[in-house]
Amino acid sequence: MNKINIGCGWRNFGDDWIHIDGGDYEHLDYNDIADLSQFEDNSMELIYASHVIEYFDREQVVPLLAEWKRVLKPYGVLRLAVPNFPVLAGLYLQKKISLEQILGPLYGKMPMAHKTIYHKTTYDFDSLKKLLGSLDFCNVRHYDWRNTEHSQFDDHSQAYIPHMDKENGT
């Protein structure tokens, strides 16, 4: 299976994955998540990007996702994880968490090489589905990280509030 982990950071999913990230990590295969020109059209079965697209504004993300779609095989899988804005807002409005507890997931401070980047937008399921539909992605649905080929890797798709409380968190 041809699989890409885009925005993998320091997480190495193993030799059967292609690792792409803008950071400086020894296990990376490539450093530019927006340019996949090294891959042929329709060559990948799975692209996984956990907490990546929110670092691009609503205009920048369109060509980014179009490039990712180009390399996906027909019926290939694009698996995205993004901060869950409705859950974060709901927990805050219900006074179950403080403002300080949602700032990290909403604004996403990430040191990268010689700069620090922050989230530029947020999504709910409907806005993400609309965006993906505009690029002809189909069968857009939620997924459970426990039922994926990368479930053993602790990444932001498994982030819960309280932080990483997988038993009691939301």
What are these regions (language model features)?
Residues 2, 15-16, 78:
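A generic secondary-structure signal marking the coil-to-beta-strand transition
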Residues 2-9:
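Conserved class I S-adenosyl-L-methionine
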Residues 10-41, 144-145, 153-164:
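Adenosine-cofactor binding site in Rossmann-like domains, unifying the SAM/SAH pocket
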Residues 44-45:
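Local beta-strand N-terminus motif with an aromatic residue
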Residues 48:
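A conserved beta-strand element that flanks and buttresses the S-adenosyl-L-methionine
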Residues 51-55:
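Short catalytic micro-motifs in class I SAM-dependent methyltransferases
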Residues 58-63, 67, 71-73, 77-170:
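S-adenosyl-L-methionine-dependent methyltransferase catalytic module, highlighting the catalytic core
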